[in-house]
């Protein structure tokens, strides 16, 4: 058994003035402290290669996924660290900060050393991939980096305090959470105490580190993902038996393509479970992906090229600037029940 110490010891990296540092010095500091692992690159949506100079670094300061945390709330008290983090990123490449038109925090709307763009619209407007596609698309031979806004705060803490502090503000959400709330958690934190006594107990549950569309399934005794600022709990749905399946007319269940009459009832809240409600079948070229994919890319043709392993066609159709999360809504509405 490994027990936590009563007091936490920190390795001291020393406070640093970012304004007097060059790109190599910033990069070395992040690598030494282990913070470079929070920077991803496109193409491939993998940990960024520090030997490659990106044409831009993109930060999305808002999340439009279901029940997503409000970054303005997480930003309170961390404004100075956030700006320092942006300053550090700007030393390495031109940095783009994407915000929502609804956000009013001065630390976002008046951030320095970055190009600020305000976005409006429903999910997936908050996806950094959508923002890259509209601001500076990635072509063959080009690289961009992405980083989530709370990781920008991690970087700011490093330079302002000389210490690594992986504390995140995490939203505990989902229809099966008794008291949805924000909490402070370390990256990789054990989730047992977060869920204990705070979820329903009369059904099987799906625990997710992240959101329901692109998060990762965990156990109730699992751990917080390194890139996640949200925890979600929904019904598993494996105990539900419905007469005649999808053929039965219903007024209380959601359907993306109006298969049920519930769309006649106007906007309302639904309790969705983890069921796929059907088996995987042949891909149907229906145009349904295009309705939820606001990028200058043809998603159905790109997916077909990926399935066929046609690299030339993948390159021509935009494989370099997308990530799995960009296809999350496509997977949700997919009539073929394909795992994209």
Describe the residue ranges of each PLM region.
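Buried, small/hydrophobic-residue-enriched core segments of structured protein domains
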Residues: 2-340
């Amino acid at each position: 058994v490994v027990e936590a110490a009563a007091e936490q010891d920190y390795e001291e990296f020393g406070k640093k003035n970012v304004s007097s540092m060059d790109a190599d010095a910033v990069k070395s500091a992040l690598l030494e402290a282990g913070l470079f692992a929070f920077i991803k690159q496109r193409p491939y949506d993998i940990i960024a290669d520090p030997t490659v100079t990106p044409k831009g670094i993109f930060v999305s300061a808002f999340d439009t996924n279901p029940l997503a945390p409000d970054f303005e709330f997480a930003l309170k008290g961390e404004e100075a660290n956030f700006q320092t983090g942006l300053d550090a990123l700007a030393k390495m490449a031109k940095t783009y900060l994407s915000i929502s038109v609804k956000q009013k925090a001065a630390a976002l709307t008046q951030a320095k050393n970055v190009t600020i763009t305000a976005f409006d619209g429903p999910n997936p407007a908050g996806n950094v991939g959508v923002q890259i596609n509209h601001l500076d698309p990635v072509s063959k031979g080009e690289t961009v980096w992405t980083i989530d806004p709370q990781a920008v705060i991690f970087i700011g803490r490093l330079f302002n305090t000389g210490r690594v502090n992986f504390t995140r503000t995490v939203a505990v959400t989902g229809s099966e959470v008794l008291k949805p709330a924000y909490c402070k958690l370390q990256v990789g934190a054990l989730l047992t105490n977060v869920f204990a006594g705070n979820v329903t107990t009369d059904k099987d549950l799906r625990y997710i580190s992240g959101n329901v569309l692109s998060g990762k399934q965990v156990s109730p005794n699992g751990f917080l993902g390194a890139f996640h600022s949200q925890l979600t709990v929904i019904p598993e749905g494996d105990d539900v038996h419905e007469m005649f399946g999808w053929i039965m007319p219903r007024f209380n269940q959601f359907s993306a393509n109006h298969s049920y009459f519930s769309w006649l009832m106007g906007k309302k809240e639904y309790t969705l479970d983890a069921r796929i409600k059907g088996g995987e079948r042949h891909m149907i070229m229906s145009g349904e992906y295009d309705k939820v994919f606001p990028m200058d890319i043809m998603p159905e043709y790109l997916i077909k090229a990926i399935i066929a392993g046609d690299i030339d066609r993948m390159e021509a159709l935009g494989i370099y600037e997308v990530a799995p999360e960009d296809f999350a809504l496509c997977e949700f509405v997919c009539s073929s029940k394909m795992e994209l």
